[in-house]
């Protein structure tokens, strides 16, 4: 397979200190005279020679199906007698703390917020007011000091203990999203010229991407908190980890059918008639991301297949893959294995390309 990952553009969002207004505001509000330790980084990538499902799968995993971290408050972490309003702390302050973008690798860190407003004016509480109370000493900040957490009226206080680092995935809580603002387009579908905008579809394509088979794609996204000195290293790690997550989830499916001749609850395999075989595979805690990959790659491997489809069953937290084809049970499993190997190979090559493109 040719090189999949064709090009990458990495652009950090930096404060424009050459602008006097921005420079003065940064110094007045946050005593900043240099760039923040963490910066949002926009990444645009071009891929060639793969189907839409692979790019869509990478996009989905990078955004909300890969483990990441957020700040959260442990039960009992509020000092009720000292805090302004427990309801506001739970519904407003906690939400603000959750969504502070962080770059964390150590889950043993604990922070606290102890703020008192002795002035006659409303006081703004920022993330810089969080203090570390447990865990190893930080060599580098894990969040920027500039995020608004809340406001204090004169004479009021806000005391929150046990603000800890929690691990999870974005599809269960948006604060865990590793990447944001993901979007992708197809570069090999003819588009309307810009001077014909009044005639074009909203997508800009002359042919619907739903009925075409694009093989040249552009994926864009933003990582909201990347250490300024290690931008390329962090982006490379994120992309490689996403490939490994997909490979790992696909490989777990192989275990379901590797001993297909033995009865097992996750696999139902039977002959419908003298020619057709039907396979029903139940995969626990799986999503449309993997379902779409399997469906697309199986179709590419078996163009004359009778049927392949999947259904996510939310209340059971499982995905059901159904395949019907004119083949023996053994041959059908062999074709499924070849399809899965193609998915694994795609993301192994993509992972290798990441190392080649991002130094």
UniProtKB/Swiss-Prot annotation:
GO cellular component terms listed in the entry, alphabetical order: DNA-directed RNA polymerase complex; host cell cytoplasm; virion component
One of the record's GO molecular function terms: protein dimerization activity
Induction: Expressed in the early phase of the viral replicative cycle.
Keyword Transcription appears in the UniProt entry: yes
GO biological process, one term: viral transcription
Positions in coiled-coil regions: none
Subcellular localization, as worded in the UniProt entry: Host cytoplasm; Virion
Keyword entries, A-Z: DNA-directed RNA polymerase, Early protein, Host cytoplasm, Transcription, Viral transcription, Virion
InterPro entries referenced in this protein's UniProt entry, alphabetically: RBP11-like (IPR036603), RBP11-like_dimer (IPR009025), RNApol_insert_sf (IPR036643)
Assembly and binders: Part of the viral DNA-directed RNA polymerase that consists of 8 polII-like subunits (RPB1, RPB2, RPB3, RPB5, RPB6, RPB7, RPB9, RPB10), a capping enzyme and a termination factor.
Function recorded in the entry: Component of the DNA-directed RNA polymerase (RNAP) that catalyzes the transcription in the cytoplasm of viral DNA into RNA using the four ribonucleoside triphosphates as substrates.
Family: In the N-terminal section; belongs to the archaeal RpoD/eukaryotic RPB3 RNA polymerase subunit family. In the C-terminal section; belongs to the archaeal RpoL/eukaryotic RPB11/RPC19 RNA polymerase subunit family.
Protein name: DNA-directed RNA polymerase RPB3-11 homolog
Organism: African swine fever virus (isolate Warthog/Namibia/Wart80/1980) (ASFV)
């Amino acid at each position: 397979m040719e090189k999949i990952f064709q090009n990458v553009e990495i652009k950090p969002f930096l404060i424009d200190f050459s602008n006097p207004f921005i420079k003065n505001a940064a110094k007045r509000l946050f005593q900043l005279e240099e760039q923040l330790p963490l910066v949002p980084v926009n990444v645009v990538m071009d891929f060639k020679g793969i189907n839409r499902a692979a790019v869509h799968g990478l996009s989905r995993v990078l955004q909300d199906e890969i483990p990441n971290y957020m700040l959260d408050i442990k039960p009992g972490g509020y000092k009720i007698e000292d805090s302004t309003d427990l309801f506001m702390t739970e519904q407003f302050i906690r939400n603000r703390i959750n969504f502070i973008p962080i770059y964390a690798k150590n889950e043993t860190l604990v922070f606290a917020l102890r703020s008192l407003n002795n002035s006659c004016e409303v006081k703004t509480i920022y993330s810089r007011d969080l203090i570390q109370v447990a865990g190893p000493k930080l060599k580098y900040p894990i969040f920027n000091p500039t995020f608004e957490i809340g406001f204090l009226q004169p004479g009021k206080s806000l005391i929150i203990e046990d603000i800890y680092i929690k691990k999870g995935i974005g599809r269960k809580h948006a604060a865990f999203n590793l990447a944001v603002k993901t979007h992708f387009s197809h570069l090999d579908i003819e588009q309307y010229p810009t001077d014909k905008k009044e005639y074009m579809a909203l997508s800009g394509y002359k042919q619907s991407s739903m009925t075409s088979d694009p093989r040249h794609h552009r994926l864009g996204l933003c990582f909201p908190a990347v250490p300024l000195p290690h931008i390329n290293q962090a982006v490379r790690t994120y992309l490689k980890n996403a490939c490994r997550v997909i490979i790992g989830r696909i490989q777990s499916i192989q275990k379901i059918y590797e001993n297909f001749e033995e009865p097992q609850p996750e696999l139902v395999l039977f002959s419908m008639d003298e020619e057709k075989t039907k396979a029903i595979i139940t995969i626990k805690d799986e999503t449309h991301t993997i379902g779409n990959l399997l469906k697309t790659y199986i179709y590419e491997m078996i163009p004359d297949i009778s049927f392949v489809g999947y259904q996510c069953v939310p209340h059971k937290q499982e995905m059901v893959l159904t395949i019907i084809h004119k083949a023996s049970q053994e041959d059908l499993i062999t074709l499924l294995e070849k399809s899965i190997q193609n998915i694994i190979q795609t993301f192994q090559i993509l992972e290798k390309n990441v190392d080649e493109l991002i130094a």
